[in-house]
Design a protein with these regions (language model features):
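FIC/Doc superfamily catalytic core
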Residues: 1-300
């Protein structure tokens, strides 16, 4: 059996888990100590990054600059023809609608503002039935994610909670990694069978809602989305080129938690630095001035 790049000896695994828990604890502590202006800037970036992550997870290919132009309604999201991913505007609308109900008021308020600012072109212009079907599909994904998470018992232990989440994802008909389906094709007299990729797993909905689960368990000060937290490679099965070893999964899960928590903490630190620079650039402003809010929105 080929050794796995993820398989670690027990002492190294323990160190990795300690790093993951330390990163999550440091993030939570920083959130609790953060000033309101810092939290607003952090949430602005988090919401934007979440929308980008959702679209890319669904298979849409674009640059950050193109995303901003598309969001503002001045360009299409990509010059490439649409693939298997779900319609981009419908996805953004589903995310923003759900987050307007977030228990974190800062995020809920920003989601409502993003809803009003979303000027991206419609996905099914002139086809009301297709548009309605796409909205129902996106809504059903969010409902399924909420139901799956609600069935998991809250626990103050982050890593066991994540392992249970991954197990539930692997057993779920909607969120499990898609299987490649064989499809026969004909090229003249030649007949071939090719494998087509299935529709991407919409685990973005679980990452969007997971912060509410940890918040209700007392693990996080605020219900953050955690884009990138679910790793489908922790749910792999045996393949001829890579025999699957169950011991890999805890390492992959701990690595994901560490990396995501560290990334969010870095974003929060940058938001605090930016908030201080904005404050220093506005000496003597009136308390009723709208300039701070405008600068925060532009900076975010």
């Amino acid at each position: 059996m080929v050794p796995s790049e993820y398989r670690l000896p027990d002492p190294v695994q323990r160190d990795l888990e300690a790093e993951a828990l330390l990163a999550l604890g440091r993030l939570d502590g920083a959130l609790r100590a953060a000033r309101p202006a810092t939290l607003r800037l952090f949430a602005l970036r988090l919401l934007r990054d979440l929308l980008v992550a959702v679209l890319r997870q669904e298979g849409h290919a674009f640059t950050d600059h193109r995303f901003h132009a598309w969001f503002a309604g001045v360009a299409t999201l990509s010059d490439l023809p649409p693939r298997l991913g779900r319609p981009p505007r419908v996805l953004c609308e589903a995310v923003l609608t759900e987050l307007t109900h977030s228990s974190w008021e800062v995020l809920a308020e920003l989601a409502a503002r993003f809803q009003a600012a979303l000027l991206a072109p419609g996905d099914h212009i002139g086809n009301d039935l297709a548009a309605q079907t796409a909205h129902q599909d996106a809504h059903s994904i969010v409902i399924a994610a909420r139901d799956l998470i609600s069935e998991l018992e809250p626990t103050p232990l982050p890593l066991p909670a994540l392992e249970r989440l991954h197990c539930a994802v692997g057993e779920h008909v909607l969120f499990a990694p898609p299987e490649r389906a064989p499809e026969p094709i004909a090229m003249g007299s030649i007949r071939l069978t090719v494998e087509r990729a299935g529709t991407p797993s919409p685990h973005w909905a679980l990452e969007m809602l997971w912060g509410e689960h940890w918040h209700s368990a007392g693990l996080m000060a605020h219900a953050l989305p955690f884009p990138g937290l679910i790793r489908l490679d922790a749910l792999r099965t045996d393949t001829p080129s890579h025999p699957w070893e169950p011991d890999e999964a805890p390492t992959i899960v701990a690595t994901a938690l560490r990396d995501v928590a560290q990334g969010l903490w870095c974003n929060l630190t940058e938001a605090d630095q930016l908030a201080r620079r904005l404050e220093d650039s506005q000496p003597g402003r009136r308390r009723s001035s709208r300039a701070p809010a405008l600068l925060e929105l532009l900076a975010g």
